[in-house]
Amino acid sequence: MNSLWLAWLYLRRRRVAAGVMVAGVALALYLPLAAHWAVDAFDDALGARAATTPMIVGARGSRFDLVLHGLYFRAHSEGTVAYSEFTALREAGHGRVIPLHVQFTAGGQPVVGTSLDYFEFRKLQMARGESMALLGDCVLGANATRNLNLGPGGNLKTDRKNLFDLAGDYPLQLNVTGVLAATGTADDEGVFVDVKTAWIIAGLGHGHDESNANNATNSPSAKLVKTHLEITPENMSTFHFHGDTTALPLTAILVEPTDAKETAMVLGRYQNSSQLQALKPPVVVDEMMGMVMRVRQFLDANYALVAGATGLLLALIVALSRRLRAREMETLFLLGCSRGTQFALQTAELLIIFTAAIVLALAAAWATVGWARDYLNTLAG
């Protein structure tokens, strides 16, 4: 105890040197700890999200992109699925079938065109307001409502894909009807609308505003006055879709088969399809994380080299310190301090430095993963 106290007093007198040593050791420990914990947190979040999503059907292409698109609304789907495919799956009775149309954003948040079944499927609860019921209605995720500073009764315009395309589709004004309770998943980031509203955003459906039509002129400038589309009780009945609605696009279809037999039937349905594919997200995510783990193994080897170099440098510093303190140690010996006590003092100094470095590294790694956990839960694509 006396050795620890004396060592502590010594280090307090040399705070800068002690602080540099603590910071160096802590940094060498922090990097592998933070990397391991962050990867584990990401693996847990991605695995949990995938485990609650039995199957995803979408355009044939990158399996990773399709799964991330269906789970996180981030990666872009390489193609589309006709709405008729959704209808066929639902009528086949394989289980619960949910449409997804995710191509646009509103205020930087992904606009998720789906059905009310999605809320039941993900076990999403309303925190405020009501669910979407009409064209143009939207429900915000917990993070989306905070980022957009909106709540029930507010309005939100969709983002233009190309700000310089004045002849392109107009943004659609969405009416916020409710806010979802926080789940800590990608659903917190979404702006949820009915799939028909998503088609209107895509320009596949439109309505007619009679009041504007009566006052309109044929001059080009009259068209440019219009800045966005708005669905109101007065013009809602005029909105319609041209052509066959069964041919309208979806970006993915979520399928929750009732049992293993239905799962096999859905997989077999698309096994030989050249345009569509059915994937099991848990399998794809495991493969994806396997690649991440291999990268982590490479980083672990690098961290081992860094730790070794840090250890050698620390040993050199200790050796030089002993040489610089040789006269000090000799004076202590002449005053009656034995060589064993001197060794105990220097050991106590190293013990304090390493303990402080370990505590600092653990705290920093824990804080980093804690800060990034919500981001990791929604990050993909």
Q: PLM features: residue spans?
A:
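Hydrophobic secondary-structure segments that place a key small or acidic residue at a functional site
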Residues: T105-S115, Q125-H228
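Interfacial "coupling" helices/loops that link adjacent transmembrane helices in transporter permeases
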Residues: R14, L313-I352
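N-terminal Sec/SRP start-transfer signal
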Residues: M1-L33, S338-R339, T347-L350
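Alpha-helical transmembrane segments of integral membrane proteins
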Residues: V20-L31, R296-L316, I353-A361
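Short helix-loop junctions at transmembrane helix boundaries
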Residues: A356-G381
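Mechanotransmission and gating elements of multispan inner-membrane complexes involved in transport
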Residues: Y170-P171, V179-R296
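Feature of multi-pass inner-membrane transport and sensor proteins
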Residues: M1-R13, D43, G47, P54, ...
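Hydrophobic, regular-secondary-structure patches
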Residues: P32-P110, D117-E120, L134, H242, ...
